[in-house]
Every structure is written in C-alpha cells, then in structure tokens.
Amino acid sequence: MASNKHFDKSRSNLSNNSDIQEPGRPPAGHSVKFAQRTSSGRYINYSRDDLDSELGGQDFMSYTVHIPPTPDNQPMDPSISQKVEEQYVANSMFTGGFKSNTRAHLMHKVIETEPNHPQMAGSKGSSCAIPGCDAKVMSDERGQDLLPCECDFKICRDCFIDAVKTGGGICPGCKEPYKNTHLTDQVDENGQQRPMLPGGGGSKMERRLSMVKSTNKSALMRSQTGDFDHNRWLFETTGTYGYGNAFWTKDGDFGSGKDGDGDGDGMGMEAQDLMSRPWRPLTRKLKIPAGVISPYRLLIFIRIVVLALFLTWRVKHQNPDAVWLWGMSVVCELWFALSWLLDQLPKLCPINRATDLQVLKEKFETPTASNPTGKSDLPGFDVFVSTADPEKEPPLVTANTILSILAAEYPVEKLSCYVSDDGGALLTFEAMAEAASFANIWVPFCRKHAIEPRNPDSYFSLKRDPYKNKVKSDFVKDRRRVKREFDEFKVRVNSLPDSIRRRSDAYHAREEIKAMKMQRQNRDDEPMEPVKIPKATWMADGTHWPGTWLTSASDHAKGDHAGIIQVMLKPPSDEPLHGVSEGFLDLTDVDIRLPLLVYVSREKRPGYDHNKKAGAMNALVRASAIMSNGPFILNLDCDHYIYNSEALREGMCFMMDRGGDRLCYVQFPQRFEGIDPSDRYANHNTVFFDVNMRALDGLMGPVYVGTGCLFRRIALYGFNPPRSKDFSPSCWSCCFPRSKKKNIPEENRALRMSDYDDEEMNLSLVPKKFGNSTFLIDSIPVAEFQGRPLADHPAVKNGRPPGALTIPRELLDASTVAEAIAVISCWYEDKTEWGSRIGWIYGSVTEDVVTGYRMHNRGWKSVYCVTKRDAFRGTAPINLTDRLHQVLRWATGSVEIFFSRNNALLASSKMKILQRIAYLNVGIYPFTSIFLIVYCFLPALSLFSGQFIVQTLNVTFLVYLLIISITLCLLALLEIKWSGISLEEWWRNEQFWLIGGTSAHLAAVLQGLLKVVAGVEISFTLTSKSGGDDIDDEFADLYMVKWTSLMIPPITIIMVNLIAIAVGFSRTIYSVVPQWSKLIGGVFFSFWVLAHLYPFAKGLMGRRGRTPTIVYVWSGLVAITISLLWVAINPPAGNTEIGGNFSFP
C-alpha cells in the first residue's frame, strides 16, 4: 500500500505528487505532477500511476494523511507558503492536455545566458547547504537570499523550520542559537511582506467574491427588466458598500467604524470628497465644425438627387446603334450608385474625441485618507500578442513588441502580457525568454529617461537627435550602455536558430551513443542493427521540448503537441521596488518591477479544429481569466508595438468615463512603418482609418479591425450591455407593432448577468456555455465588477466604490496554472459556445469583423481613439503580390460574411440603421469587382467597335457627367478637410480601389461562391513580416516582382485599353468621316482606367531603371502593328484603302 503525506501550502506539494483536483478537466480525474525530468526527458516520480505501470497487475490504494497540529507540526503562515509556492510555480513549465497528466517541470535553466532579474523564470538562486537537500534558499523581491543567521549559512525554508522545531533553534552552520526563530519575522527583516486580501482566512475563491446565494432573495433583488443586479457582486468587507448602485448608509459614515459596522478605512470621507469636488469628464466629444459638415451633408444629398436623375435619363435614352454596350454600362452604373450610397451614408455623422490623462490620474492615483501612498485604483489589463510561425514572423520583431508592452506607462502590478505561440516553437519560447532578460535593463531605462517609443529597435533607429529634451546628466552614458546591450541582445536572438540546432544535434548524438552502448551490452555476439532514435529538439536545461520539434514527430508537430504555459516573469510585488546605484545603471529612484509575462502554446491534436487565430485568442481569454483576470484585454499582432507609452491610459479613459460600462471595445487606428514614401499601394489606408472609422464613431462605433483593440472582457463573454432591453424601438414600430415574443436566432441571443442569479442556472447552463471550469466561471463576475467606472458622480450608473481595486493581486499557485492548462486543451471547447457566441467568432477568415459585429448586434457601443502621438505602429506588406494576397483574404472574409448569418440584413433591432448599412457594405463591396471589370473593358470595346455608351455626346449627358464629377471632387475635398488626410492619400486610395477591385476582389467572390456552393474550404498562408535587418535597401520588397494569377485581370485590362486607344486613333485618322466625339469619349475613359492602374504597372516594372529600353520599343511596335492590322481587317465603311494608295501587305 502506498501513501503520500499531504501538507497544505508546503513545499511537499511541489516535490511530490499532489492531488489537485482540476474542475476544468473531463471526469478522467488527472492529477498535477511536480517532478524532475532527466536529461532524456523522462519524469522521475513515484505516484500511484507510475507504480501501476511498473508493477503491472498489482493493486494499490492511495490515501492522504492529514497530520493534526502538534507542538512539532504547526501550520505555516499562509502568506509565506503562498509566496514560496509562487516562486516554484514561476520557475516551472506546465504541460498537459488530452489524455495526459498536467505536469510542472522545474526549469533550472531557460536560456543559455544567466537570467539577471528575480522575477524571471530560471533565475539563479542559492541551494540549501544542508547535506542531502537540494532546495532553493528563500529570496526576497530583489532576488537576494534570506539568511536567518549572521553567519550567512544558506538554509531553505523547510530545513529552517526543522532546525527551529527539532534542533533547538541552533544554526547548523555556526552552531549558535538563532536570534529570531519566526519565519515571518525573517521575511519582514529582509524584505517587504505582501499585504493579504481582506478576510484572508478563507480560500482563494472565497476571497474573490461575497455572494448572496439565496434564490428567494435573488428573485427579489432582480430588476423588473431582468437586468443583472450589480449590488450582489461585491468584494468582501465588514462594512456597507460603495457608491452608485451599491448601498450607502444614510448618515454617510461608511468606513468610519463608529458603530462597529465600518472597517475604519476612511472610505466614507473619500466618497464625500468625491461628491464635493467638481466633476470632470475623462473624455470629450469634439464635433466637426458646422462650416464643414453642413456643406458635406448637403453635397451628399445633391449628389444622390443628381445620380437618380442621371440614371433615369440613361435608362430612358438608349443607344440603338449599340444596345449591348448601353445595357452593360447602365447595369454597371446602377450598381456603382448603390455601392457609393452604401459607402457614403454611414459618413453623415463623423466626430472626433479627446481624452484627459490628468483627470484619469487625479481620480485613480491621487493619495487619499484611505490610500495615503496613492496606490492605483485602475483595473487590470491583459495584453495578448499572437504569433504562429517564427519563420514568417521573426522572433526579434515579436520580442521588440513584448518589450514595448512591458515598458508601457501603466501600473506594473495591474499589467499582464500573454504571448500566444500557435506554432509551439522552441525558437519563439527562447526568444521571449531573452526578451524578458533584456527587459531588466530596457524597462528601467525607459522609465528613468521617459523614452519614446519604447520598442528598442525603433528607438535606436530614429533619425533624429536622441539627446534632445533629455535633462539628466547620465543619459548619454546610460544610452550608450543600453545600446551596447541591445546589440548583444539582437545577436543572441538572431543566433537562436543555429544555437538550438547545434544543441539538439549534440544531445541527439549523445543519445545515439548511449543507445549503441546499451545495444552492445545487451547483444554481445549478435549483429548490430542501426540505432534509430527520434531526433528531438532540446531545451537549454537538457530536456526535451514539449512543443513542436524541428524534425516533426508524434506528439511534437505543429498540429500535434501538448499545451504549454511558462511564466516568464512572475507577478511583481504590490509596492514599488527601487533599484540601486551600484548596478549597470543608476536606478536609485526608478521602479525596477516588471509586469507579468506568460508564454502560452495551446494544445493541438489531430482531429480537432483549431480555428486558427480566433481559436488561439479564445484560449488566451480563458487562460488569462484564470491567471490574472484583467477586466480589459488589448490584442496586438506580433508586428504591432506600442508607439505611445500612454496609449493604455488613453483607452482606459473611455472605459472609465460616464457611460463607459456600455462600451465593448476601444479601437485604435493602425499606423505603419517601412512604407515607401509615395505609398504606392495605399498601405497606410488612411481613407479607411481616418475617414470611415471616424464616421462610424458617430454611430454605434467603429468596426473591429483585428489588432490595436482594447476589449471589455465581459463583452467578449457574450453578455448584454448594462441597462439594455430585449428590443429597442425601431422606426417601423409605430406602423407594424412587434409581438411581445419573438424567436431570436441562436447566434443573436446574448447572455445576461441575471443568468447567474439562480444557483440551478449556474450548475446546468453556465458550464454548457463556458465549459466546465469553475475557476473560469467564478472569474466572470469579478471581471464585471472590476471593469465598472468609478462612481464619483450621481449620474454614473453601474459604478464601483473608490479604492476597491487597491487590494493586492492573488499569488499564483499550482492549481491555478494547472487549471489554465486545462482550459487551453484541444477538447475544452467541445459542446460549448466558445467561437459561436462567446469570444472570437469562428467560421470566417475575417473573424475580427464578425466578432465586432456580434457585439454591436447585442447593443454594445464602441469608440475610436485617435491619439496625438500614434498609439501603435506595425508593418505592412509593401510588395505588390503580398499586398494583393492580403486584400484577397479580407475580401474573401467579406464574401463569407455576406453568405452567412452574420449578414447585416439579419441584424437585430438593437443595431442602428446606418450602422447596419455600414456592416452591409462590408459584405457587399467585393461584388463590385464584377461590374468594375466590365466597366474597365467598356472604353476598349467602345474604341474597337467605333460606338459609345450614348448615341451622341449631347449637352444633357455632359452636364450630368460634369455635376457628378464636381460633387465627387468637392466631397473628397471636404472629407480631406474634416479627416486631416492629404489629397495624395485620397488619390492613392482611389487607385488601389480599382487595382484590388479588378484582381483580389474578383478572386474573393469566386472563392466565396465555391465555398458556399461546393463546400470548398479556403486556406491562406501567413503574411510574412519583415525582420527589419535589411539596412542596405529598406524598400527591397517593393521592387521584387513575384508572379501571381491575381495579376492577370489588371494586365489584361491595361493591354486591351492600350491597344484600343491605338486602334481607335488609327481608325479615326484614316476614316473618311472622322468621328472625333466618340474617339474623345473612348480615349478619356480609357485614360481614366489606365491612370488608376498606373501604380500596378509601375510595380510590374520592378526597380526603376532595370527595365531594358528595348522592351518599351518592342511594346510600341507591337501596339502599332496590332492597330494597323485591326484597321486593315475592319476598315472604315466605304473605304478599303488605308491612307490613300498605301495598302497593308
């Protein structure tokens, strides 16, 4: 019979097989194993499972022995045991998944270099000097050893307790009695102790919430509309609760402790101070001047009227000489008018917004009676960074993005960063570890000298004076040192692929030698067989990498590997930790703490649909909810970094302002670096980000564009916004009354926080929606409460009391990370609503647009945050082929949306009509390519046939054409005026609209139809990101010509129109009765087409000056020859000769 002693919150939990129940797992009942791996990757432990496997059919029974407290066995202070356990958890790699145990592998070494920050995984620590004990000496927040004796004898926590209890309090080193035998006092003497949560006597989940569980009482507390009653979800305390929707005492003595009801923290005085202060908003809405917006709206109305009259005239006046030409042109013009209307109507209400960061600081970080140190009351922030392939997304780019996040101006203890590696590559893992190591130097340097931007690669590449406005005398010295360290950091990261390959080859050779020796020992005289050992990928500590190997093998391939979670930087302490002057930099007055950094690679197994980026994002949502549970989430692509260190605070101004609880997300504009100065292919996309998105901000808000978006976690969970009704009155309700009960499509139904009121609802429906993780389910109301605005004004509804978020965050323990492993498993989403109604929505290559649409469809609003200094910057493909494939993916997603239930025509009544039109245009715009291609060929057909779309160029046609053109130009000028874009940017957008419309959009329509009709699945390759190492030619990709079938339609249009111009010109010259009006009309429209396709033609030429002159000569000769041939074959009527006596041979 085997038995294991189980001590709560002790190191024996980490060294033995601890029976930690995982609520998020299937009924199989896996356990979390803390074990040491050998160099070959085998785990050494003696759990019941291992004994069963080794001893075969013998029956074993395990039980847990709880030893009662005795003089020799006293329970340890929970704060100390939690702190030590967090230290072990932060230095362990957790793996697990489908049909496998969750294991924590203690990482003695994460990277080849030595970590130099106490928060980093694998940081160096001294070992216990007691013979036979290999435990680590307890350390403080600075990583310094805590030694209880003046002789500096190194002893671990367990051995120190044994020496005090059984050794008479004698130091094993100097044999002198300890002056202090209390472990808590030893910690207090050497470092600061973390304050505990209120009511620390309860368990972790009991400390999270104080919930009224009576179903009868909850029925009374529920509002008449069925809205969630926010008074029930409050943090534990002995007094009454805050201001806003919570209860206040009538005499206003909350927190005064006069009658024993308050807790004496002075929060009542703070609330009175809030009421007495003049209320200041965090954001302001800046309307467009009436002198600009009024003429703009008037011109839209005039153009609509003129278009209607013009199309009516076109339909009534046919061209009997070319009815086919007239018919095609009229159909195309009707569609263009509809497309323009769908694009223009949502632009009727553009607005601008501004934030006030000073007010944010005053409200959330100003010292008060209850918060004398001015500890931040801002909510937590979880930042998601996604990467999938280190070959196409260079690790150095991702590492720079991580460094910009870690250095952001936001309370360190409130900020967490999660890196999703969907490829499970060791290269990405070690690059993130290198970034965490370099952050020890980079982040304090940024804080000390107020560096902008805080991406080191971008900062050291700035083409301006780096010493401008820097007042500290040691800045030059510090910058030089940091620059040297960054150069070494880049060398280490760029050499990681070769380092990992050499390391793996060396270990593989060693394993082969071992196997050959074993073979010789087992087979003395028998012939030797070739030794075949799978070529594994090895980590720096000499063990197998649990993710994807360089040479794919079973359980170690891109689509088949275990889930991995590694805490790269453990959670920081709650109090500032200042540096010292003796180090690399003088950091005496600089906070050297770093935010929580977690590496996550979700489990992938064959037979499970992983849903690409959307699935990776949902895995991060669940894992982060368990580990940090920040009520707000910012998602960034790996090549988009924080350019403005205050960007997070600016976004938080909107969420924390009055009415901010109804905002589902704050979208920031995308800004790009590395674009050619002329922006040949409209990569900046300023018309969309500065015109369309500002206009949507005046409605229900901008669409979600995939990156640079700050989410409210509770909105991602599929809940309705606060104070929402099932149906809002529409413009047709007066004429067609809506029935009281209506069936709503399943994907349009939203969860309500009132669904949690009934305990039976929790037990039955909630796991079916979110999965069977109780940790995840219990975190939902916590995120809802923490995400509320501050109740500092009577008009603020659904507010939270001040100071509620100044409590320290909970420490990480093994069960928490084990639960996070469970929720990123491949099977977790089975039979749940993840991806269908919760989180990022599956089923489209543009999951971002669909996810934002679902939120707006539930009644949520979003805002557009344009900061004075760009919030984020990224890279964009400047190569023509890559740009076309990017546009193809976007357009294909739009076609999928149009043929799905996410079509805006099926939107709920909660969505405004203009917002619905905007989403409808998102699904319709690729279909314009069909009519656009036809219309681009019409000028050529007109020149070839000698006819035109109208019978004659009369005054009516020309007047209509002139008015339509003038109104279009005036609208463009006014858009430029209120949006701030340039005329060149507007023209580049027009050019690429035609380039993309005649190439990528047409292919997207065909692919979308194939998927809908034939069920052909669509797959796209990942867009390659530039590593930024090509300093010789920054725009080398711009001139690279890579052939793709998407180029065929534009090339054909260019060639046909050029030939048609030559043919029409030749025919008119040699005609007896030249028809110059038809020639001018055809040539004008052909030049209109060619002018739009000029950037495309320029891209085909490659680098300037590389196209041989003979190519242009032969092109001209071929065009002239074809023109003469056409005239010879089809000469003008009544004349069989060309140019008099000259005849074509």
Swiss-Prot record:
Catalytic EC class: transferase
Topology term for the membrane: Multi-pass membrane protein
Name of the encoding gene: CSLD2
Function: Thought to be a Golgi-localized beta-glycan synthase that polymerize the backbones of noncellulosic polysaccharides (hemicelluloses) of plant cell wall.
Keyword Cell wall biogenesis/degradation: yes
Main location: Golgi
UniProt source species: Arabidopsis thaliana
Catalytic machinery residues: 422, 848
Annotated Gene Ontology cellular component terms: endosome; Golgi apparatus; Golgi membrane; trans-Golgi network
Entry EC no(s): 2.4.1.-
UniProt-recorded name of the protein: Cellulose synthase-like protein D2
